[in-house]
């Protein structure tokens, strides 16, 4: 199998403003042809990281390397990267063709090549018959396509996208997610995408970098991030989760027996000690509601509500101590009586057990191991 080429490296990159440090020492490898998303809440450092890669922001310490060339001190136009912004930044007095071709004209590329390149790009973003229109004649989605085509005109090695879909309505945003992913695969260039939207990240990414308070919390494929969160923050931030605190009371052949305040449960896990306090994370779709007791589980609760949500039925279970369990089931299942007592369980391999250590940080380089996808697995630091 051909070894993946690292196109972008961050080494010990930090950023401090007057109000404090917004990006802690960051090491990150991004591969050629990869779609990587920097995902996290407002203020986590994702946009700062993107701006440092682009050259719009100067790192306080550390290095940025593109194709092994140190570009840390170079201006944006010397880095062979382009950026697509949320506000499109189109020239209002130029038509679509002139907007897309602007940088090529400035570089004095031949008119023939400009025509060929711009025509091809406009076809790729489904605007082939609209090259004469002005920006004020375009919808939000069309403006975004023009901005992407313009950013690709210079044939950058890396395309940076700073929350480019945030201003679009839900339906258009979902359409653009698929279009962007298809475009990226057809071009084969590296996309680094910034968003706070989990659905965007899960839908489009080859790998996701989850950020929190200036740290890289976890790096992995969408499946790894969703099904095997490494920290409570990741489990809580990505999708819906039921997160409980429990104590390990028995450990037999990688199956843990755990005591919650409301009863005993089981889950798979290694590296945990008896009497250790841990977090249990179970996704709502993996929780089972039964009238019968399941071996190894003594967790009971009362049905507080059932909500029809189209593709799923959301059931809310209240435990005796006031904790809430969210359960997603098929809407065709027989409704439960509100107030009825039920048993709660799950398959032992569907629960994720996490240490309760605060501020767990993952360093993708110093402690990195190649996973089955060729990406970096990260271990606790």
What is each residue range found by the language model?
Residues 35, 74-86, 90-233:
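ABC ATPase nucleotide-binding domains
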Residues 54:
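Helix-to-loop junction immediately C-terminal to a conserved catalytic motif
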Residues 26-37, 91:
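Pre-Walker A (P-loop) beta-loop-beta motif of ABC nucleotide-binding domains
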Residues 9, 29, 65, 343-345:
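ABC ATPase nucleotide-binding domain
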Residues 8, 23-25:
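Conserved structural motif at the start of ABC-family nucleotide-binding domains
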Residues 39-41:
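The feature captures the beta-strand-to-loop junction immediately N-terminal to the Walker
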Residues 62-70:
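Conserved ABC transporter NBD signature motif
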Residues 241, 251-381:
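Non-catalytic connector elements of ABC transporters
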């Amino acid at each position: 199998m051909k070894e993946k080429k690292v196109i972008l490296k961050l080494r010990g990159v930090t950023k401090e403003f007057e109000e404090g440090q917004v990006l802690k020492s960051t090491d990150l490898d991004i591969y050629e042809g990869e779609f990587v998303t920097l995902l996290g809440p407002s203020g986590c450092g994702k946009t700062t990281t993107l701006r440092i890669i682009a050259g719009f922001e100067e790192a306080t310490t550390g290095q940025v390397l593109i194709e092994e060339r140190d570009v840390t001190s170079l201006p944006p136009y010397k880095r062979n990267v382009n950026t697509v912004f949320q506000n499109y930044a189109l020239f209002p007095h130029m038509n679509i063709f002139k907007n897309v071709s602007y940088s090529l004209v400035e570089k004095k590329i031949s008119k023939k090549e400009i025509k060929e390149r711009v025509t091809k790009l406009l076809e790729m973003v489904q605007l082939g018959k609209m090259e004469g229109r002005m920006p004020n004649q375009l919808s939000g989605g069309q403006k975004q396509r023009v901005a992407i085509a313009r950013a690709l005109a210079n044939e950058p090695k890396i395309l940076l996208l700073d929350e480019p879909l945030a201003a679009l309505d839900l339906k258009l945003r979902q359409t653009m997610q698929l279009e962007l992913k298809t475009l990226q695969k057809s071009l084969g260039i590296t996309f680094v995408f910034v968003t706070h939207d989990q659905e965007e990240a899960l839908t489009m990414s080859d790998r996701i970098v989850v950020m929190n308070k200036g740290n890289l919390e976890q790096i992995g494929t969408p499946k790894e991030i969703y099904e095997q969160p490494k920290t409570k923050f990741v489990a809580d931030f990505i999708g819906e989760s039921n997160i409980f605190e429990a104590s390990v009371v028995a450990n037999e052949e990688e199956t843990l027996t755990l005591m919650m305040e409301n009863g005993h449960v089981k889950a798979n896990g290694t590296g945990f000690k008896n009497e250790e306090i841990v977090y249990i994370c179970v996704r709502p779709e993996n929780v089972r509601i039964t009238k019968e007791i399941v071996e190894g589980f003594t967790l009971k609760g009362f049905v507080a509500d059932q909500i029809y949500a189209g593709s799923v039925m959301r059931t809310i279970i209240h435990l005796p101590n006031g904790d809430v369990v969210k359960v997603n089931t098929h809407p065709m299942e027989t409704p439960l009586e509100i107030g009825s007592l039920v048993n709660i369980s799950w398959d032992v391999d569907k629960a994720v057990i996490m240490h309760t250590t605060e501020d767990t940080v993952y360093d993708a380089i110093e402690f990195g191991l190649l996973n089955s996808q060729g990406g970096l697995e990260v271990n606790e630091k």
